[in-house]
Amino acid sequence: MGKDYYKILGIPSGANEDEIKKAYRKMALKYHPDKNKEPNAEEKFKEIAEAYDVLSDPKKRSLYDQYGEEGLKTGGGSSGGSGGSFHYTFHGDPHATFASFFGGSNPFDIFFASSRSTRPFSGFDPDDMDVDEDEDPFGAFGRFGFNGLSRGPRRAPEPLYPRRKVQDPPVVHELRVSLEEIYHGSTKRMKITRRRLNPDGRTVRTEDKILHIVIKRGWKEGTKITFPKEGDATPDNIPADIVFVLKDKPHAHFRRDGTNVLYSALISLKEALCGCTVNIPTIDGRVIPLPCNDVIKPGTVKRLRGEGLPFPKVPTQRGDLIVEFKVRFPDRLTPQTRQILKQHLPCS
């Protein structure tokens, strides 16, 4: 069953134009979200605006009276009657309808947003509100006129304070970066999707935004990059900060230890005992020959100074490239080789 617009406004189906306006004025003031804090007030307020939009327009009202809501929105009867070329959908902003009805202003702004504007409310007369005595839309604020003078001794005025907005907690994302990006510095582009307030300050839209994250040379894992108030916005909150936390990507050759870079070099037992030269790759793509003339034991460490990552505060200085040696032992030895080793290797 479709909506009963007459019932929504509380008027009979034969109501005239003045009665429709009077009913809209009464119901819109009663259910305006600035006054009515019931959970369904916003939806009811929108229904009232839709009902007024239809019944205040002779063409829409005629189609509605003939075919009901469904007929109105589908273009009339299924046989293609006089309304067959007309299709109705309510796309309006109920708050805009409300403000337009009262001469382009929201009468509740005197209570809820007086700090935003001091201009008079053109076309709005509080005495023109035809509402029941017990349904006074401004009853919660005392019987005060718009010039600040009391209209009667009904209630004492109550102080009003704007509701204090609280910022949402930060939205944290992990941002993985390679050691090369840390070495050279880089800029990453991250797309976020968030809700933002429309100019009316009430409704929201969904939009995408590209955040440019500048990663400076030598930044440590765990460094936080914050974009203030780039989170979701609603009429009742302060948007959250968007925070990116750096996390090192696993690397094929290196591990990170602060500004030092660790590299594991695997050599044979022969190379460990007899000496060798090992080619060591660097974080910037070069190769450094490292002579090893002494016996290399498993776990031996050699340090190439200044070949690590930049210091965050002094990027011209760098940490070290630390080479950790691993020795690959043979799986088996021939009897002849075993005998030769016994003859030549020291006992201790």
Curated annotation (Swiss-Prot):
GO BP: negative regulation of transcription by RNA polymerase II; protein folding; response to unfolded protein
Domain of life: Eukaryota
InterPro entries: DnaJ_C, DnaJ_domain, DnaJ_domain_CS, DnaJ_subfamily_B, HSP40/DnaJ_pept-bd, J_dom_sf
Name assigned to this protein: DnaJ homolog subfamily B member 5
TM region positions: none
One of the record's GO molecular function terms: protein-folding chaperone binding
Record CDD domains: DnaJ, DnaJ_C
Keyword annotations from UniProtKB, A to Z: Chaperone
Gene: Dnajb5
Domain J, residue spans: 4-68
GO cellular component: cytosol; nucleus
Coiled coil: none
Induction, per UniProt: Expressed under normal conditions, its expression can further be increased after various stress treatments.
Pfam families linked to this entry: DnaJ, DnaJ_C
